């Protein structure tokens, strides 16, 4: 059985500012860096990781780095694990889009693409294909894949035969297990974030 460990990147600058990021390359905050370290420690203590993959965006690569460095593994980057492309909404504050483009946002919440952006089916198909290739290339191994809220959500929805709308976005630096038996995917534990609870009372320190 192949076990894929999907980790959403730590908090980014745009996450903190409540802005749409999409595929723009935005760095982690100090809190995000600490989340990556703590999640890395959790992974190293609970799994024997054989390979590391990541979206090619720096916030995902930085989240994979603590594990890769500790194990002396290379990080294999693949742009197919990127976040959904959000088109005209990239860089915009979420509150502004909700207020000024309410109709567009309502349609987006029901599964339509953002104006000029990527469709949900395009996102789902590219992430699924990349995941399938990684799983087939690593039989009976445990693989870390650092990605994004939207891309992980799309994959979990497809494997769970659900719609994106009904699957919640994973929290920053949370861990979700995807299992592969050589033919089919199945979901293991999803959205694990208990290891981050020590940070909840410390966030003000990192946001100042």
Protein language model features and the residues they cover:
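Extreme N-terminal starter segment of soluble prokaryotic enzymes
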Residues: 1-5
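Loop-to-helix element that buttresses phosphate recognition and phosphoryl-transfer chemistry
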Residues: 6-63, 113-128
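Phosphate-coordination/substrate-recognition cap region in phosphate-metabolizing enzymes
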Residues: 38-101
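Glycine-rich phosphate-binding loop signature in dinucleotide/nucleotide-binding domains
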Residues: 45-48, 134-141
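Active-site signature of alpha/beta-hydrolase-fold catalytic machinery across serine-
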Residues: 66, 154-158
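Short basic (Lys/Arg) and small-residue
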Residues: 148
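Domain-level recognition of soluble alpha/beta enzyme cores
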Residues: 162-186
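Acidic, His/Gly-rich catalytic cores of divalent-metal-dependent hydrolytic chemistry
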Residues: 188-208
């Amino acid at each position: 059985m192949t076990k894929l460990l999907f980790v959403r990147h730590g908090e980014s600058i745009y996450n903190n500012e409540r802005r749409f990021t999409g595929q723009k390359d935005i760095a982690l905050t100090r809190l995000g860096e600490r989340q990556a370290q703590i999640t890395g420690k959790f992974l190293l203590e609970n799994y024997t990781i054989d390979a590391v993959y990541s979206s090619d965006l720096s916030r995902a690569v930085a989240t994979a780095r603590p594990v890769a460095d500790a194990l002396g593994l290379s990080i294999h980057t693949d742009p197919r694990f990127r976040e959904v492309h959000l088109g005209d909404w990239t860089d915009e504050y979420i509150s502004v889009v909700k207020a000024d483009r309410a109709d567009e946002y309502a349609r987006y919440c029901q599964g339509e693409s953002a104006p000029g952006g990527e469709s949900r089916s395009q996102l789902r198909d590219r992430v699924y294909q990349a995941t399938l290739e990684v799983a087939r290339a690593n039989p009976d191994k445990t693989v870390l894949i650092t990605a994004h809220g939207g891309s992980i959500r799309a994959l979990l929805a497809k494997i769970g035969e659900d719609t994106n709308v009904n699957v919640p976005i994973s929290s920053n630096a949370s861990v979700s297990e995807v299992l592969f038996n050589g033919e089919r995917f199945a979901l293991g534990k999803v959205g694990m974030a208990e290891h981050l609870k020590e940070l909840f009372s410390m966030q003000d320190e990192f946001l100042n």
